[in-house]
Amino acid sequence: MNIIGTANITKACEEKNVKLIYFSTNYVYPGTAGNYKENDSLLPVNNYAWSKLGGESSVHLYKNSLILRVCMTEKPFVHKEAFSNIKTSFMYQEDVAKILFKLINKKGIINIGGPSMYIYDFVRKNNKLITKKNLKKNNKIGMPVNSSLNINKMKKILRWYNTGTIYLNIKI
């Protein structure tokens, strides 16, 4: 779906000259160092991430497109445990949707996410009942230890500021 389906959608958008916005993932980066910029080297960590990179490859060839490398989760967080040793740049889906409206006319690649933090710390802000879980080294699920994003490009476009609890200055 992420590769062939995206290639077909890209072709259709190009034929009709329609803007294409593709949601990719922060997992296309190696996931070891964190603070990944849009032009950093890519090395997907699992099959899902490889499929998203395949989709990106099709979209990238179309000039009227925007690739968003997104790090998001649902609110409320649906799991009872959260990793305390995995760093990421989570942002809630509803906040990503608000950002999308501000980026709709942009082109290229933009990282979308919140500040770098451990998953547990992010979730704990809204769910005090969440418990800690550690991901073991050499995990079989292909979870990177630090897939946090450099979001400076997004901040510059949005004139972002951190209010302390919500990381947006966006009104729709």
Predicted regions mapped to residue ranges:
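Mid/C-terminal beta-alpha module of Rossmann-like enzyme folds, strongest
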Residues: 99, 103-146, 150
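Substrate-positioning beta->alpha
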Residues: 70, 77-104
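Amphipathic terminal alpha-helices
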Residues: 156, 161-172
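Active-site "gating" loop of Rossmann-like NAD(P)-dependent oxidoreductase/epimerase domains
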Residues: 4, 25-45
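NAD(P)-cofactor binding segment of oxidoreductase domains
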Residues: 1-21
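SDR active-site strand-loop-helix element
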Residues: 20-26, 68-70
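Active-site Tyr-X1-5-Lys
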Residues: 15, 43-71
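Short-chain dehydrogenase/reductase
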Residues: 40-53, 86-94, 116-117
